[in-house]
Amino acid sequence: MRDSIYLLWIDNRLVVIIMMVMMVSCRCVLGLENINPIFFDEGLSHLFGEGNLIRSPDDRSVRLLLDKYTGSGFISSSMYQHGFFSSLIKLPGAYTAGIVVAFYTSNGDVFVKDHDELDIEFLGNLEGKPWRFQTNMYGNGSTNRGREERYRLWFDPSKEFHRYSILWTPTKIIFWVDDVPIREILRKEEMNGDYPQKPMSLYATIWDASSWATSGGKFGVDYTFSPFVSEFKDIALDGCNVSDSFPGENNNNNIGNYNNINCSVSDQFLMSNDYSTISPKQATAMRRFRERYMYYSYCYDTIRYSVPPPECVIVTAEKNRFRDTGRLKFGGSHPKVHKARKKRRRNRSTPVVSADL
């Protein structure tokens, strides 16, 4: 965008045409491998943690720090009625027990009693033990009906950047890790208000969750290892920008009129993109991921829900691996692997869940 504005000084008419062609062509091919990142000041704002949010000189990336004084976070400058939210993220290394790094959408600041939320939350661990993460969904303040799933990763998220994405449309929600869809929620009529329906902002935060994040609160944040640094770059926001329909500094007061906004064109664009459709290869990758790396699912937690929530798709092969608590029967974070089978796979260099696109 900045290069385009600069070129306007050369030939106004010609460059406007080029800009329009480029915008159309980029949107047509937009997918997980071709995402349009924004500059921080084009769509994001500082949320909290004075001094602990550090922007890069090129304004394409940002570091969020946690120290003994405060965590930090940023928020999208606008609210969106459906959208695709994505970022390359690198997590802190070494001892990270008690830490949560979150990438999520929410409207809790506007709809205090009936907020919606979609979460990707990374849970820190003791040094030498892997990060874990969870996804969750709340609709219309249904916090007493949490829909969380917990997983491990097939890589070390503190060594290099990986892309994490949330797709939210009128009919489905998909959570992505790189090019692998890890969870799909299809909207059911029986869900009623439990499906997120109100405009949300994008958030990214790092904070002290010593009371629950690691082993149920057994291990907390050790600030002798601080500062803890998480990094976000090539952040993408695509969706129906509701805030633009209510200009002014206090436009959140008018967001309640969101039903009057027509987002059909934006929704159609979202639902026609690559990241809204799970290919057969990606479906296989998702199944493998869930078989090997998911260690808790609310859909199989029959103590919590005697009848699974309506959006749950009960997969017999998955269900047989879980206790009635929703956790794996084997007591670990993944099923045991027979030695012979493990030996055959020892020389594999590609991740078993890669969509191989």
Curated annotation (Swiss-Prot):
Keyword Glycoprotein among UniProt keywords: yes
Q: GO molecular function terms here?
A: hydrolase activity, hydrolyzing O-glycosyl compounds; polysaccharide binding; xyloglucan:xyloglucosyl transferase activity
Keyword Plastid assigned: no
Compositional bias ranges of the Basic residues kind: 335-348
UniProt-annotated binding residues for xyloglucan: E121, Q134, T135, N136, N144, R145, G146, R147, E148, S211, W212, G216, R304
Known EC number(s)? 2.4.1.207
Cell compartment(s), UniProt:
Secreted, Cell wall; Secreted, Extracellular space, Apoplast
Indicate what this protein is called per its UniProt record: Probable xyloglucan endotransglucosylase/hydrolase protein 29
Q: Which organism is it from?
A: Arabidopsis thaliana (Mouse-ear cress)
Its taxonomic path starts at: Eukaryota, Viridiplantae, Streptophyta, Embryophyta, Tracheophyta
